[in-house]
Amino acid sequence: AILGAPFMLFTLAIFLLAVTVLTLKFMGKRDSAIKVNPELISFDLKFFIFAFFLILAVSLIKIKFLNYALAAFLVLFYLFYIKKILEHEAAGDETYHPLHFEKYFGKKHVLIYIQTALGLILIISGAHFFIGFLIVTGTAIGISMLVFSLLITPIATELPEKYNSITWIIRGKDTLALANITGAVAFQSTLIVSIGLLFTEWILDWHTLLNITLALSSAIFIFITLKFKKKLYAEPLLIGGLFYVIYIILALELVKI
């Protein structure tokens, strides 16, 4: 589940983002160019690629001390990321809507804490329910729990929140839409992975290594496209769906290699 989230975001979520843009283009509401802040998105991509290459290397070396060292580095690396992001100046389309509670009670800081706490309670409750469902379902259908968690868990936990990206794309807030994905990946690939490195055996089989490789491939492809074209178009981002299908086929052994 830890490594499945970055994979899902850089494959399925990116694919759905591209499909949304192309649907709007077909409806005559926009073109296929995704108008993002190239400096911000490039930084997110470089951050993820560097972090995930380190994770892949340490995972292959299999020395416990390196796991602890990398976990500490990833925490510091994410703090560096936060510092750089806070220095970023908001683009013209980066506007925000008020909290839901503000509509009824006015703008008060206590509402921020209340809405955050309620959201956290719902997330924790949903996680307990989902884990139980995952165990029962995986056992019933006979699929490896690792493969099942890599494929299903990120969809259930990450994809609903990424609906925000779809909403922002529809509203023409392209930088917010893509940064919602790349920013989440930055968090998932550092702080969350550091927890796994510290508190699990961190022995990765070929399913997980394939997962990491495809996530990296998608991120590198997007980075190269942005680097040379200075902008992104929806059509090339459809490759995220291809990477996701490739993983399903190989992980479920629908095709023998």
Where are these regions (language model features)?
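Hydrophobic alpha-helical segments, chiefly the membrane-spanning helices
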Residues: 1-257
